A protein has these predicted regions:
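N-terminal ligand-binding/catalytic initiation module
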Residues: 1-255
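Glycine-rich phosphate/diphosphate-binding loop of Rossmann-like nucleotide-binding domains
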Residues: 252, 260-335
Protein backbone atom coordinates (compact mmCIF):
# COMPACT_ATOMS: atom_id res chain seq x y z
CA UNK A 1 0.00 0.00 0.00
CA UNK A 2 1.50 3.34 -1.07
CA UNK A 3 -1.17 5.55 0.50
CA UNK A 4 -0.07 7.07 3.78
CA UNK A 5 -1.38 8.93 6.79
CA UNK A 6 -4.60 10.90 6.58
CA UNK A 7 -5.36 9.59 3.08
CA UNK A 8 -5.74 6.09 4.55
CA UNK A 9 -8.11 7.29 7.25
CA UNK A 10 -10.15 9.12 4.59
CA UNK A 11 -10.55 5.94 2.49
CA UNK A 12 -13.69 4.22 3.76
CA UNK A 13 -12.68 0.89 2.22
CA UNK A 14 -9.27 0.56 3.92
CA UNK A 15 -9.70 2.61 7.09
CA UNK A 16 -9.75 0.42 10.21
CA UNK A 17 -9.67 3.26 12.72
CA UNK A 18 -8.42 2.14 16.11
CA UNK A 19 -7.94 -1.42 14.80
CA UNK A 20 -4.69 -0.53 13.02
CA UNK A 21 -1.89 -2.40 14.80
CA UNK A 22 1.15 -0.63 16.25
CA UNK A 23 3.26 -1.90 13.35
CA UNK A 24 0.71 -0.71 10.77
CA UNK A 25 0.58 2.70 12.41
CA UNK A 26 4.37 3.07 12.13
CA UNK A 27 4.57 1.85 8.53
CA UNK A 28 1.57 3.82 7.29
CA UNK A 29 2.31 7.12 9.00
CA UNK A 30 -0.66 6.87 11.35
CA UNK A 31 1.16 7.44 14.64
CA UNK A 32 -0.21 10.57 16.23
CA UNK A 33 -3.37 10.48 14.13
CA UNK A 34 -5.19 7.91 16.27
CA UNK A 35 -5.69 7.35 20.01
CA UNK A 36 -2.91 5.07 21.36
CA UNK A 37 -5.10 2.07 22.22
CA UNK A 38 -5.25 -0.68 19.58
CA UNK A 39 -8.68 -2.34 19.51
CA UNK A 40 -10.04 -5.49 17.92
CA UNK A 41 -13.23 -5.53 15.86
CA UNK A 42 -15.38 -6.80 18.73
CA UNK A 43 -14.41 -3.84 20.90
CA UNK A 44 -15.13 -1.43 18.07
CA UNK A 45 -18.53 -3.05 17.59
CA UNK A 46 -19.38 -2.58 21.26
CA UNK A 47 -18.61 1.13 20.97
CA UNK A 48 -20.78 1.41 17.85
CA UNK A 49 -23.64 -0.35 19.64
CA UNK A 50 -23.42 2.01 22.61
CA UNK A 51 -23.56 5.09 20.40
CA UNK A 52 -26.28 3.65 18.15
CA UNK A 53 -28.42 2.89 21.22
CA UNK A 54 -28.19 6.53 22.30
CA UNK A 55 -29.99 7.78 19.18
CA UNK A 56 -33.59 8.77 19.88
CA UNK A 57 -35.14 8.65 16.39
CA UNK A 58 -35.01 6.33 13.40
CA UNK A 59 -33.71 9.17 11.23
CA UNK A 60 -30.97 9.83 13.77
CA UNK A 61 -30.05 6.14 13.68
CA UNK A 62 -30.02 6.20 9.88
CA UNK A 63 -27.72 9.24 9.80
CA UNK A 64 -25.40 7.60 12.33
CA UNK A 65 -25.15 4.42 10.26
CA UNK A 66 -24.53 6.37 7.05
CA UNK A 67 -21.70 8.28 8.76
CA UNK A 68 -20.21 4.99 9.94
CA UNK A 69 -20.47 3.56 6.43
CA UNK A 70 -18.73 6.64 5.05
CA UNK A 71 -15.71 6.36 7.32
CA UNK A 72 -15.22 2.62 7.98
CA UNK A 73 -16.86 0.16 5.60
CA UNK A 74 -15.70 -2.98 7.41
CA UNK A 75 -17.05 -1.80 10.75
CA UNK A 76 -20.36 -0.70 9.20
CA UNK A 77 -21.01 -4.05 7.54
CA UNK A 78 -19.87 -6.01 10.57
CA UNK A 79 -22.42 -4.11 12.68
CA UNK A 80 -25.13 -4.44 10.02
CA UNK A 81 -24.64 -8.19 9.66
CA UNK A 82 -24.54 -8.65 13.44
CA UNK A 83 -27.93 -6.91 13.84
CA UNK A 84 -29.42 -7.42 10.37
CA UNK A 85 -33.09 -7.91 11.29
CA UNK A 86 -33.07 -4.87 13.58
CA UNK A 87 -31.19 -2.59 11.20
CA UNK A 88 -32.84 -3.39 7.85
CA UNK A 89 -35.79 -1.03 8.53
CA UNK A 90 -33.27 1.70 9.45
CA UNK A 91 -30.87 1.27 6.55
CA UNK A 92 -33.67 0.80 4.02
CA UNK A 93 -37.46 0.93 4.13
CA UNK A 94 -39.23 2.55 5.81
CA UNK A 95 -36.61 4.93 7.26
CA UNK A 96 -34.79 5.50 3.97
CA UNK A 97 -37.92 7.25 2.67
CA UNK A 98 -37.67 9.91 5.38
CA UNK A 99 -33.92 10.14 4.78
CA UNK A 100 -34.56 10.79 1.08
CA UNK A 101 -37.06 13.53 1.94
CA UNK A 102 -34.45 15.13 4.23
CA UNK A 103 -31.46 14.25 2.04
CA UNK A 104 -30.21 17.78 1.38
CA UNK A 105 -30.45 18.58 5.09
CA UNK A 106 -28.62 15.50 6.38
CA UNK A 107 -25.96 15.32 3.66
CA UNK A 108 -22.54 14.55 5.17
CA UNK A 109 -20.08 13.15 2.64
CA UNK A 110 -19.82 12.22 -1.03
CA UNK A 111 -20.82 8.73 -2.14
CA UNK A 112 -21.41 7.55 -5.69
CA UNK A 113 -21.80 9.43 -8.96
CA UNK A 114 -23.94 12.53 -9.52
CA UNK A 115 -24.68 13.37 -13.15
CA UNK A 116 -26.76 16.48 -13.75
CA UNK A 117 -28.18 17.38 -17.14
CA UNK A 118 -25.92 20.44 -17.64
CA UNK A 119 -22.93 18.05 -17.36
CA UNK A 120 -24.17 15.71 -20.09
CA UNK A 121 -21.11 16.40 -22.28
CA UNK A 122 -18.70 15.33 -19.51
CA UNK A 123 -20.18 11.99 -18.46
CA UNK A 124 -17.05 9.90 -19.06
CA UNK A 125 -14.92 12.40 -17.13
CA UNK A 126 -17.32 12.45 -14.18
CA UNK A 127 -17.56 8.66 -14.13
CA UNK A 128 -13.77 8.45 -13.97
CA UNK A 129 -13.76 10.99 -11.13
CA UNK A 130 -16.26 8.90 -9.16
CA UNK A 131 -14.62 5.48 -9.51
CA UNK A 132 -10.93 6.37 -9.78
CA UNK A 133 -8.96 3.17 -10.30
CA UNK A 134 -11.66 0.91 -8.82
CA UNK A 135 -13.49 -1.77 -10.79
CA UNK A 136 -17.29 -1.81 -10.61
CA UNK A 137 -19.51 -4.89 -10.86
CA UNK A 138 -22.94 -3.53 -9.89
CA UNK A 139 -24.53 -0.12 -10.44
CA UNK A 140 -27.90 1.07 -9.12
CA UNK A 141 -29.15 4.20 -10.88
CA UNK A 142 -32.17 6.45 -10.28
CA UNK A 143 -33.49 9.80 -11.42
CA UNK A 144 -35.43 10.32 -8.19
CA UNK A 145 -38.81 10.82 -9.85
CA UNK A 146 -40.76 8.03 -8.16
CA UNK A 147 -39.09 7.32 -4.83
CA UNK A 148 -40.93 4.54 -3.00
CA UNK A 149 -44.48 5.90 -2.59
CA UNK A 150 -43.25 9.44 -1.99
CA UNK A 151 -43.12 10.77 -5.52
CA UNK A 152 -40.55 13.17 -6.95
CA UNK A 153 -37.73 13.76 -4.46
CA UNK A 154 -35.15 14.98 -6.96
CA UNK A 155 -31.58 14.46 -5.88
CA UNK A 156 -32.83 13.05 -2.57
CA UNK A 157 -33.57 9.84 -4.45
CA UNK A 158 -29.85 9.04 -4.19
CA UNK A 159 -30.62 7.49 -0.80
CA UNK A 160 -32.28 4.56 -2.57
CA UNK A 161 -29.28 3.33 -4.63
CA UNK A 162 -27.04 3.78 -1.60
CA UNK A 163 -29.41 1.78 0.60
CA UNK A 164 -30.04 -0.94 -2.00
CA UNK A 165 -26.33 -1.55 -2.50
CA UNK A 166 -25.76 -1.72 1.26
CA UNK A 167 -28.35 -4.51 1.41
CA UNK A 168 -26.69 -6.33 -1.49
CA UNK A 169 -23.40 -6.32 0.39
CA UNK A 170 -24.89 -7.33 3.74
CA UNK A 171 -27.18 -9.99 2.33
CA UNK A 172 -25.43 -11.05 -0.86
CA UNK A 173 -21.76 -10.56 -0.09
CA UNK A 174 -20.99 -8.01 -2.81
CA UNK A 175 -17.70 -6.17 -2.36
CA UNK A 176 -18.86 -2.63 -1.49
CA UNK A 177 -15.85 -1.10 -3.24
CA UNK A 178 -17.07 -2.66 -6.50
CA UNK A 179 -20.54 -1.11 -6.35
CA UNK A 180 -21.65 2.33 -7.50
CA UNK A 181 -24.83 4.30 -6.70
CA UNK A 182 -25.72 6.81 -9.42
CA UNK A 183 -28.06 9.80 -9.50
CA UNK A 184 -29.18 11.14 -12.88
CA UNK A 185 -30.18 14.66 -11.86
CA UNK A 186 -32.50 15.93 -14.58
CA UNK A 187 -34.20 18.44 -12.29
CA UNK A 188 -37.35 18.08 -10.22
CA UNK A 189 -40.99 19.07 -10.51
CA UNK A 190 -41.28 19.24 -6.72
CA UNK A 191 -41.85 22.94 -6.04
CA UNK A 192 -41.04 22.56 -2.35
CA UNK A 193 -37.57 21.32 -3.24
CA UNK A 194 -37.00 23.99 -5.88
CA UNK A 195 -37.78 26.69 -3.31
CA UNK A 196 -35.70 25.09 -0.54
CA UNK A 197 -32.45 27.09 -0.10
CA UNK A 198 -30.71 23.92 1.13
CA UNK A 199 -31.69 21.76 -1.85
CA UNK A 200 -28.52 20.28 -3.37
CA UNK A 201 -29.87 19.23 -6.77
CA UNK A 202 -30.11 21.05 -10.09
CA UNK A 203 -32.78 23.74 -9.64
CA UNK A 204 -34.81 23.24 -12.78
CA UNK A 205 -38.05 21.62 -13.88
CA UNK A 206 -37.48 18.05 -15.05
CA UNK A 207 -35.98 17.63 -18.49
CA UNK A 208 -37.99 15.23 -20.63
CA UNK A 209 -38.14 13.77 -24.13
CA UNK A 210 -35.04 13.74 -26.33
CA UNK A 211 -33.07 15.86 -23.87
CA UNK A 212 -33.72 13.36 -21.09
CA UNK A 213 -32.64 10.48 -23.32
CA UNK A 214 -29.48 12.36 -24.22
CA UNK A 215 -28.19 12.16 -20.64
CA UNK A 216 -29.32 8.57 -20.08
CA UNK A 217 -27.74 7.44 -23.37
CA UNK A 218 -24.47 9.17 -22.52
CA UNK A 219 -24.44 7.50 -19.10
CA UNK A 220 -25.15 4.00 -20.43
CA UNK A 221 -22.53 4.41 -23.18
CA UNK A 222 -19.87 5.63 -20.75
CA UNK A 223 -20.65 2.92 -18.21
CA UNK A 224 -20.55 0.12 -20.78
CA UNK A 225 -17.32 1.45 -22.25
CA UNK A 226 -15.55 1.61 -18.88
CA UNK A 227 -17.09 -1.56 -17.39
CA UNK A 228 -18.35 -3.85 -20.19
CA UNK A 229 -19.33 -6.63 -17.74
CA UNK A 230 -21.20 -4.40 -15.27
CA UNK A 231 -24.75 -5.13 -14.13
CA UNK A 232 -26.99 -2.04 -14.14
CA UNK A 233 -30.15 -1.82 -12.05
CA UNK A 234 -32.77 0.83 -12.89
CA UNK A 235 -34.41 1.98 -9.66
CA UNK A 236 -37.42 4.20 -8.86
CA UNK A 237 -38.03 5.61 -12.33
CA UNK A 238 -41.54 6.85 -13.11
CA UNK A 239 -43.66 4.54 -15.22
CA UNK A 240 -43.32 7.02 -18.08
CA UNK A 241 -39.65 6.05 -18.34
CA UNK A 242 -39.28 2.70 -16.58
CA UNK A 243 -40.42 0.27 -19.29
CA UNK A 244 -39.12 2.44 -22.09
CA UNK A 245 -35.60 2.72 -20.69
CA UNK A 246 -35.45 -1.00 -19.97
CA UNK A 247 -36.43 -1.80 -23.56
CA UNK A 248 -34.12 0.86 -24.99
CA UNK A 249 -30.98 -0.28 -23.19
CA UNK A 250 -31.42 -3.95 -22.30
CA UNK A 251 -29.50 -5.11 -25.40
CA UNK A 252 -26.75 -2.53 -24.90
CA UNK A 253 -25.85 -3.34 -21.31
CA UNK A 254 -26.72 -6.06 -18.79
CA UNK A 255 -29.57 -4.43 -16.88
CA UNK A 256 -32.87 -4.94 -15.12
CA UNK A 257 -35.56 -2.87 -13.44
CA UNK A 258 -36.23 -4.03 -9.90
CA UNK A 259 -39.64 -2.34 -9.71
CA UNK A 260 -40.82 -4.09 -12.87
CA UNK A 261 -38.90 -7.36 -12.91
CA UNK A 262 -37.68 -7.92 -9.36
CA UNK A 263 -41.06 -7.34 -7.72
CA UNK A 264 -42.77 -9.37 -10.45
CA UNK A 265 -40.40 -12.32 -10.08
CA UNK A 266 -40.92 -12.52 -6.31
CA UNK A 267 -44.69 -12.03 -6.56
CA UNK A 268 -45.27 -14.59 -9.30
CA UNK A 269 -42.97 -17.07 -7.57
CA UNK A 270 -45.15 -16.75 -4.46
CA UNK A 271 -48.33 -17.16 -6.54
CA UNK A 272 -47.02 -20.26 -8.30
CA UNK A 273 -45.86 -21.76 -5.00
CA UNK A 274 -49.26 -21.07 -3.44
CA UNK A 275 -51.09 -22.64 -6.38
CA UNK A 276 -48.86 -25.68 -6.11
CA UNK A 277 -49.60 -26.06 -2.41
CA UNK A 278 -53.33 -25.79 -3.15
CA UNK A 279 -53.09 -28.26 -6.02
CA UNK A 280 -54.39 -25.67 -8.49
CA UNK A 281 -52.88 -25.55 -12.02
CA UNK A 282 -51.17 -22.29 -13.02
CA UNK A 283 -53.48 -22.24 -16.03
CA UNK A 284 -56.47 -21.78 -13.69
CA UNK A 285 -55.06 -18.57 -12.21
CA UNK A 286 -57.35 -15.52 -12.03
CA UNK A 287 -55.35 -12.44 -11.07
CA UNK A 288 -56.43 -8.97 -9.91
CA UNK A 289 -53.59 -6.49 -9.38
CA UNK A 290 -54.31 -3.40 -7.29
CA UNK A 291 -52.10 -0.62 -8.60
CA UNK A 292 -51.16 -0.19 -12.24
CA UNK A 293 -47.72 1.35 -11.87
CA UNK A 294 -44.39 -0.20 -12.81
CA UNK A 295 -44.68 -2.94 -10.20
CA UNK A 296 -48.33 -3.79 -10.90
CA UNK A 297 -47.94 -3.98 -14.66
CA UNK A 298 -44.73 -5.95 -14.22
CA UNK A 299 -46.50 -8.52 -12.03
CA UNK A 300 -49.33 -8.87 -14.55
CA UNK A 301 -46.90 -9.33 -17.45
CA UNK A 302 -44.87 -11.93 -15.55
CA UNK A 303 -48.05 -13.79 -14.54
CA UNK A 304 -49.13 -13.94 -18.18
CA UNK A 305 -45.76 -15.41 -19.12
CA UNK A 306 -46.11 -18.01 -16.36
CA UNK A 307 -49.55 -19.03 -17.66
CA UNK A 308 -48.26 -19.23 -21.24
CA UNK A 309 -45.38 -21.41 -20.05
CA UNK A 310 -48.00 -23.67 -18.44
CA UNK A 311 -49.73 -24.14 -21.80
CA UNK A 312 -52.19 -21.24 -22.13
CA UNK A 313 -52.32 -18.98 -25.14
CA UNK A 314 -51.21 -15.40 -24.53
CA UNK A 315 -54.71 -14.16 -25.40
CA UNK A 316 -56.41 -16.42 -22.85
CA UNK A 317 -53.83 -15.62 -20.17
CA UNK A 318 -54.28 -11.87 -20.63
CA UNK A 319 -58.07 -12.22 -20.33
CA UNK A 320 -57.63 -13.63 -16.81
CA UNK A 321 -55.60 -10.67 -15.51
CA UNK A 322 -57.20 -7.42 -14.35
CA UNK A 323 -55.57 -4.17 -13.22
CA UNK A 324 -57.26 -1.78 -10.79
CA UNK A 325 -56.02 1.69 -9.88
CA UNK A 326 -57.54 4.72 -8.14
CA UNK A 327 -60.00 5.19 -11.03
CA UNK A 328 -61.20 1.59 -10.84
CA UNK A 329 -60.82 -1.28 -13.29
CA UNK A 330 -58.60 -0.40 -16.25
CA UNK A 331 -59.98 -1.11 -19.72
CA UNK A 332 -59.40 0.04 -23.28
CA UNK A 333 -62.37 2.41 -23.36
CA UNK A 334 -61.15 4.62 -20.51
CA UNK A 335 -60.45 8.28 -21.28
Amino acid sequence: MTTQGRAILADRYVNKGTAFSADERRRLGLDGLLPPVVEDLDTQLRRVEVEYSSKQTDLGRHVFLRALQDRNSVLFYAFLEQHLAELLPIVYTPTVGLACQQWSRIYRRERGLFLSWPQRDRVEELLDNAVGDLDVDVVVVTDGERVLGLGDLGIGGMGIPVGKLALYTAGGGLDPSRTLPVMLDVGTDNDALLSDPLYLGWRHQRVRGAEYDELVDAFVDALGKRFPDVMLQWEDFAQLHANRLLARHRDRICSFNDDIQGTAAVSVAAIVAGLGTAGTPVGDLRLVVVGAGSAGTGIASQAVRAMVAAGDSEHDAERRCWLVDRDGLLHDRMQ
